[in-house]
A protein has these predicted regions:
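Catalytic-core environment of secreted peptidases
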Residues: 31-51, 56-80, 153-177, 288-361
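Soluble metallo-hydrolase cores and metallopeptidase-like ectodomains found primarily
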Residues: 24-27, 110-113, 117-147, 226-326, ...
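His/Asp/Glu-rich mid-to-C-terminal helical/loop segments that flank catalytic regions of hydrolases
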Residues: 335, 342, 475-526
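Noncatalytic luminal/extracellular "stalk/propeptide" segments of secretory-pathway proteins
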Residues: 52-167
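Second-shell loop/turn segments in exported
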Residues: 25-33, 49-59, 74, 87, ...
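A conserved hydrophobic secondary-structure block that centers on an alpha-helix together
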Residues: 134-210
């Protein structure tokens, strides 16, 4: 069913409450301070080769944090972290050590037959029994963990796609897969407290060819106080998995195929003979979120957060261009945050400051797993119960293939998932000020790209805070050195930023904050 967009926007304008239908001339005045020329100035610095791709924990990211802090200071933003613009994010890097794996009398080779994702705690042990849990799914319609106590056990599961019977998922009952992808299964298994997880990946060989250098480098995790160390994970080939299961007289793929054909779990303890040593090298990592505050007036205790991640993926060893500059991802969003900070501080200086306070938040660690925003959401500088909205900007400087003939667009994700008020405000501000084509393709919970889970707004939404994610879509230079400043459409970067500005202006100045009144149809667990 198609919506009549004109009627919908008119209805939204009538329903949003105390905001006038006509343009707010004061808002327009300060929105016009967001320019393509200023955007170019900031992005040319942040996405320069000097910043070496801004990888979290590396000198380029530290330089970016210093630049953003200096901009906030020059604008006169309040430094909200005990007089600083920097919030330390406690990260550690866990790099794989010289791990070994032997099953029976056969020794297997690291980064050929298996690879490890290590924990902060080394694991060296002889294993006489593993608990085979099939696909590792724990769903009310298909529960392979029912009745199992996995705490302290060694668990073996397959990362193969969930079982389908007669072309239909045994979980959804349709041709569409459930949310139980391999990452969700692993997180759920980790929550059960096993001593070690052995993960069979049928694509191990191709993954090693494609990602060998990445898999041999360290991964970053939050070093949360009082958090128990997660189990190490050994990802193994079919040959290794079959050797572990040798006493069952069955291969791992025949066992999972039997589960798929019957639609019934077949979890069981299996006797085996495994000797393994999973070793790691742990080191502390320097990383910071950067934030500055424009304090509100009569509603200053309520906070609107405008965010973007300033980190990217750093350097590459391949090709002649070694720097993944990340001009669009997410230099463009960080630039948008800086531009809006300038516009709001100019308004405040001239007596038109916002009623609610606005926190401009540039986070680190997004490319490592949304780590900076996760830390902020769990250790907030301002109470989450007083945080009324998060407007998150991640990639707003390019045009994707779908819109090559109409660049005047932006994807919006999440505006209607927690608050009907926020969605109406968003529709109204666009219709009144920027008139971009709003594309809601990625707002569908069934969209396979799962964009909703892939940027920092997620860590606010999971705490029940209404969010909007602004995004230009994926393009051919995504996560490549060719994501350069020269390819940015600065006219569109500025226009999309103005949409976020006008939305923030409305939220910050209205009598009542957006009410949480919608049950989110995106599952909470990504």
């Amino acid at each position: 069913m198609k919506h009549n967009r004109s009627i919908f926007i008119l209805a939204a304008a009538l329903l949003v409450g105390n905001t006038a239908v006509a343009q707010d001339k004061i808002a327009v005045k300060y929105g016009n301070y967001i320019t393509k020329e200023d955007a170019y100035k900031h992005l040319s610095v942040l996405a320069s080769d000097e910043y070496e791709g801004r990888e979290t924990g590396k000198p380029g990211a530290w330089k970016a944090a210093e630049y953003i802090s200096a901009q906030f200071k020059s604008l006169g933003l309040i430094a909200p972290v005990n007089g600083s613009y920097l919030q330390k994010v406690p990260l550690v890097e866990i790099a794989p050590g010289n791990s070994t794996l032997k099953v029976g009398n056969t020794s297997f080779t690291n980064f050929k037959d298996f690879y490890t994702s290590s924990s902060k705690v080394d694991f060296t042990k002889s294993i006489s029994e593993v608990v085979f849990v099939g696909y590792g799914i724990e769903d009310e319609k298909f529960n392979e963990l029912a009745g199992l106590d996995l705490k302290g056990k060694v668990v073996l599961y397959s990362t193969e796609k969930e079982p389908f019977v007669n072309g239909k998922s045994i979980i959804t009952g349709t041709e569409k897969a459930s949310s139980w992808n391999s990452a969700k299964r692993l997180r759920n298994l980790q929550s059960k407290g096993p001593a070690l997880i052995i993960s069979f990946n049928p694509d191990l060989e191709s993954n090693l060819k494609r990602m060998a250098s990445y898999l041999q480098t360290g991964r970053l995790i939050l070093d949360k106080p009082n958090q128990p160390a997660q189990a190490s994970v050994i990802t193994v080939s079919k040959a290794v998995a079959d050797a572990i299961l040798a006493k069952t007289k069955s291969s791992i793929t025949s066992l999972t195929a039997a589960i798929a054909s019957t639609g019934k779990p077949a979890s069981k303890a299996v006797k085996t003979g495994v000797q393994t040593s999973v070793l790691s090298k742990v080191s502390n990592v320097k990383a910071d979120n950067v934030m500055g505050l424009v304090e509100g007036t009569d509603l200053k205790d309520e906070i609107v957060v405008v965010s973007g991640h300033y980190d990217h993926i750093g350097l590459t060893t391949e090709g002649t261009d070694k720097v993944n500059n990340g001009a669009d991802d997410d230099g463009s969003g960080t630039t948008g945050v800086l531009e809006m900070a300038q516009a709001f501080t100019k308004a405040k200086a001239e007596g038109h400051g916002p009623r609610r306070s606005i926190l401009f938040l540039a986070v680190c660690g997004e490319e490592k797993g949304l780590l900076g925003s996760e830390w902020y959401s769990e250790s907030p500088i301002f109470p989450l119960e007083k945080t009324v909205t998060n407007l998150n900007i991640d990639m707003i400087g390019r045009v994707d293939p779908k819109h090559k003939d109409n660049p005047d667009y932006v994807y919006l994700i999440g505006s209607d998932k927690l608050s009907s008020d926020l969605h109406k405000i968003s529709e109204y501000t666009n219709a009144t000020y920027t008139r971009l084509t709003i594309d809601y393709k990625y707002n569908d919970p069934n969209d396979p790209e799962r964009i909703y889970y892939r940027s920092d707004h997620y860590n606010f939404a999971k705490h029940g805070i209404p969010i909007i994610f602004y995004f230009n879509g994926v393009h051919e230079d995504y996560h490549k050195p060719s994501d350069e400043v020269s390819k940015i459409n600065f006219e569109m970067l500025a226009k999309r930023t103005r949409l976020v500005f006008f939305t923030a202006w409305d939220i910050a100045n209205r009598d009542k904050a957006p009410v949480v009144d919608v049950k989110n149809d995106f599952p909470a667990d990504r």
